Amino acid sequence: MSALLAHATQCLDTGRPAQAILALQEALRIAPGAAAIHHDLGFLCLQAGRLPEAIAALRSALTLDPSFAQASLCLGIALQGQGDTAGALAAYREAASLQPALTAAHVCLGALLESLGEQTLAIASFRSGAASGPASVWGRLSNARALVAENRDVEAEFVLRELVSLHPANAMGHEMLAMVFANGGRFEEARACYQRAIDAAPQLAGSYYDLTRCRRITRDDEALLSRMRSALVAPGLTADARLKVHLALGKALDDLGEPAAAMQHFDDADALRSSLVRFDTAAFEARVERLIDHFTPDLIARASDGGSSDATAVLIMGLPRSGTTLVEQILSSHPQAHGGGELPFWTVRGARWEEANVNGAKPALDFATLGAEYMGQLHALARQALRVTDKMPLNILWAGLIHLALPRATLIHCRRAGIDIATSIHRTYFNPYVSFPTGGAELVAAIRAVERLTAHWREVLPANRFIEVDYEQLACAPEPAIRRLIAACGLSWDEACLRPEHNPRVIKTPSKWQARQPIHRDAIESWRRYEPWLGPLAALVP
């Protein structure tokens, strides 16, 4: 037995993980009741990307030793890699409960909760992680994650600078510091940090994706392209990580004027995302029909009977990649407005309301209380601002519910050509837990369903509360479009709104680079360069 374990260690130390796995499998035939060996086998399979084998081995370890916190943590990572969100959450929580000092469990739990829109729970988990090991690498990362989630980026930068100073080979620290820089528009510093992260961990897929989105790739970047191609075929890369590398390579090849090769990578990324999360087109279309049927003109007309009287909220909504970040950047350039970013409030409340209705509960909502709860969160972001924005794009699903709770709020619908939206979505990384497709016939159907719902909102919501901004008009003739937008929000005119690229605020959305550029027309009809390779998306071509 000891010889087999020593051989496994030697294989691992010499870069032969497959042989190490074989040695551990042989050891388990001799000692099937050894929980530690099951854990080690699961851990190696996890590193090798062999997730089903990892899950089986880790579950065996936990069956033999239910108090094995590290096995529960690794199980959570493996389950998350396979798209089992509920299983991953349970495993992370169990690991953190079994061993509160296991900081990585708190960080993984917080990161997953954050991706699901559970911001308050995520911050609490990050805070627990930071408290469990404040001087450790994971503790510092956890503290930084909490600070970023609380929009305290300056403090997060200090924590991360200290981390990479103490641990210069820590790729996650460099990657997170790069993200803080990129969110603040400090792209040169971000690029340097992403490069350090890649140097430290050449398979760090997120750094490739974010680095390529911080600048245009040129023919001088052959070394970067070579590294990305190597990372793509490296063993152990999870489906989500491989997805990011495909998108990074697609962006790079797009910049280099190779749209056919770029589109192939975008298609491959979409296929991987589809393997992680299945989009149910029929269920989404049924949801849209239920919303249309429920929010009748008579119901909307009664909005003034309840809800909050607060007019502070400006909700910017529409399909993803329709220009919502640009509109928020314009509005938040006004001295009396504050950009709140993408807030998960209505995603969570809308889903709860919908679930209750579908289950036949038909809850009687207190719209004034609902509106007051939301406004409490909004005012906490900027208590002195006359207007505070919330630019969660798919709040478009809940426009009727929002109007009933906030009848004086301004709802801004960002409208853009469907085919340009589709090709932009197809090129962009979206968290697998965002329930929206990124390609194929599913994306076409989803866009058409949202457009159908939007047409309903256009008919039933008051015209002075549901304002529409056309991306193409905004890009081609910015000043008149911006003046109309500012007036519709009840703000006095300010010239700063014409120069949103100078707005220094933190931007956390995929458009953080584009939103820092002067308003331009380059993205109009951007689909044309992919025309021969559009596939099902061609159905959206006007």
Tell where the protein language model's regions lie, with residue ranges.
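PAPS-dependent sulfotransferases, especially Golgi type II membrane carbohydrate sulfotransferases
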Residues: 208-212, 225-236, 245-313, 368-382, ...
